[in-house]
Amino acid sequence: VSDDALAVVVVTHNSAGALAALGASLTPQLRGDDELVIVDNASSDATVSMARNLGERAQVIETRVNAGFAAGCRRGVQASAAPLLFLLNPDTVLADGALERLRAVAASRPDWAAWQPAVMLPDGRINTAGGVVHFLGIGWAGRCGHGAGGLATQPYEAAFASGAALVVRRDDWQQLGGLRDDYFLYGEDLDLGLRLWLAGRRVGVEPRARVTHDYVFDRGAQKWFLLERNRWRTLLATYPLALLVALAPALVAAELGILAIAARDGWLRAKLRAQLATAIGLPRTLARRRAVQGTRRIGAAAFAAHLTAELDSPNLAAPRAAATLGGAYWRLMRLLLR
């Protein structure tokens, strides 16, 4: 197996309608030493039969329960051997040459542990040009909704790479434990990205590789529950202690503000469930924090450099006054952390 062989891992759940398009764009780009592993999370439609139709080289793993995206990815990684892992959503389509461009990053950027292509929406706008993380732990798809003309023409770094189309070196995956399987869904890519930066590794984007993602932002209560619960799990485990102390007043104020927004927008119960889950899981989170911080190779100031005070996602919005105060607070904290 060559050093740039890819293990493509696709996790499915009732994804029958998407697999034909994915397969048509993906399988012609696979090399002889690449692998294709499809992990089906207890689909009730024709996903498994569609997956088997992708060809003999497709290894299809069926699970009896839907344990979530990260758990499915971990199962697929365990069943593969290639040195580069490519975690790919089933509702994606690869542009011509995307795999070769992503593969080439392994040699051209040896300090990158993880990277992504430019992930595009079906209408040609950007879905994500690299993940962005607010200092409160809120993450989002960078430049979502912007025109493709604003994309860079050379590789660049980002806070985290999107789990919709995520390349990770197997060595780094194994050293840091890969995606957290207790997240079920949402934020596991952000968590991995911050852990990689904390460990002294780097994360980036190869914008010349393009993948189209049939993405729609879900505003359901269950998503808000998972986003908020997982935000706190990531924040408490990955942020250096000096940064947590510096942010404590802002985190408390933000919780009050988010509670008010949740009450206004109809997901207060989901937010309260997330707080309860965070409290109940605190002993486990603190135990995990000790393990994560044991891998740390950079200080609080260097880690903070990968966070931002700007909240420019079209799917998330903060009141102007709160954004202004947050920006001033963050600038002050960055100075104190130096």
State each model region's role.
Residues 93-133:
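Conserved donor NDP-sugar-binding/catalytic core segment of glycosyltransferases
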Residues 24-33:
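Short, acidic, metal-binding catalytic loop of nucleotide-sugar glycosyltransferases
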Residues 25, 40-49, 65:
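A conserved acidic beta->alpha catalytic loop
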Residues 199-307, 326-327:
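Active-site-adjacent helix/loop segment of glycosyltransferases
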Residues 159-210:
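A short, conserved alpha-helix in the catalytic core of glycosyltransferases
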Residues 85:
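Short aromatic/hydrophobic "clamp" motif used to bind/position activated sugar donors
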Residues 62-80, 90:
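Glycine-rich, basic loop-to-helix element that forms the pyrophosphate-binding segment
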Residues 18-20, 45-53:
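Acidic helix N-cap motif at the loop->helix transition within catalytic regions
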